[in-house]
Amino acid sequence: MYIFHGRVQGIGLRARTYSMAKSLGLSGYIKNRDDGTVEAVFQGDEEKIKRIIEYIKGIAYIEKIDYFDDDVKYNDFQIRY
């Protein structure tokens, strides 16, 4: 699980990341958190995960990214609310 800190809400990040994740064939989810951060899980090819992280860095002002292991397996990618 990734937690993105910075200017990450109110900029269309979830919708744009959803589209990119679907096009890359990744599974997982993305959602806004109450504290102003964005939480995301990406599962799939490691190079594609690196690519989507770089994509997010290009469309949002990221101050910090935290990473935590997530053992849950996902079958598709979705926006959570």
From Swiss-Prot:
Keywords: Hydrolase. It catalyses: an acyl phosphate + H2O = a carboxylate + phosphate + H(+). Its EC number is 3.6.1.7. InterPro entries: Acylphosphatase, Acylphosphatase-like_dom, Acylphosphatase-like_dom_sf. Residues 1-81 form the Acylphosphatase-like domain. The keyword Hydrolase applies. It is an enzyme of class 3 (hydrolase). It comes from the Archaea. One of its GO terms (molecular function) is acylphosphatase activity. The keyword Hydrolase applies. The active site is at residues 14, 32. Belongs to the acylphosphatase family. This is Acylphosphatase. It comes from Picrophilus torridus (strain ATCC 700027 / DSM 9790 / JCM 10055 / NBRC 100828 / KAW 2/3).
